[in-house]
Amino acid sequence: MELRYLRYFVAVAEARNFTRAAHDLGISQPPLSQQIQRLEREIGTPLLRRLTRGVELTEAGESFYVDACQILALSDAALEKTKGIARGMNGSLVPGITSSAAFHSQIFSLLYQFQQRYPAVALRQVEGNMATLMHALGEAELDIAFVRLPCESSKAFNLRIIAEEPMVIALHRSHPLSGESALSLAQLSDAVPVIFPPEVAPGLYEQVYDGCRRAGVDMSRARQSSQISSSISMVDAGFGFALVPQSMTCICLPNVTWHPLQDASLKTEIAIAWRRFERSRTVKRFLEMF
């Protein structure tokens, strides 16, 4: 059954007159009457009762009218939705966010701006470590990913840097240097470092590990946390000190003091990664924002 038959029938049912319906549809009356008769033959029962001055719906016609309106509405909505997806105006966007960057305000600011500009696009964020995100992006389970650089596995994708931030030191309030402002890692050579696992952010892990080692910190004494954020909780509990990205200073714990790092060379970048030869208009719309 063709959709145009349904449109013709609905037009006649609402106009209660073949002549007016034909005028509304922009066709002549004889072809319209023929199409309605063909529809009735296909269904196997009359839908309209022909009167002297128009038509009225039969009982079957009343039921069919309700269903026809729903089918046409769904068809029109599906068509508009598909057109919108092709234009990147609706559909969905699944961004991955590495847990080490989840506290950086610019990421969610960008996502919010995109949602405001394209409210019909459904956003579903996925948080994970770098290895998980890079695999998911390669398997098209994610559309984009916010990653920490440097990252060897991200080199297979297009990258665009969106932020750079320095590293800072988290100390327990009881530490003798907690009242100081900027600190060097060499001043903490006798302290116990708290460090996250390498799979969380491999490049950042190497930076932190090598930076501490070069400053004389004994990394064999290091305590390992499950995530960067949990390393701050371990500092709060008294396990040692942590070297983390500046955006993590938004985590306020009662026993943690924050200190800028004197070595300005220790810094990290956040980038957006997406697949090469990406065809999604929604992804392209997002990238057009900056």
Curated annotation (Swiss-Prot):
Pfam families: HTH_1, LysR_substrate. GO terms for cellular component: protein-DNA complex. It comes from the Bacteria. Residues 18-37 bind DNA. Signal peptide: none annotated. Keywords: DNA-binding, Transcription, Transcription regulation. One of its GO terms (molecular function) is DNA-binding transcription factor activity. CDD domains: PBP2_BudR. Residues 1-58 form the HTH lysR-type domain. Regulator of the budABC operon for 2,3-butanediol synthesis. Belongs to the LysR transcriptional regulatory family. This is HTH-type transcriptional regulator BudR.
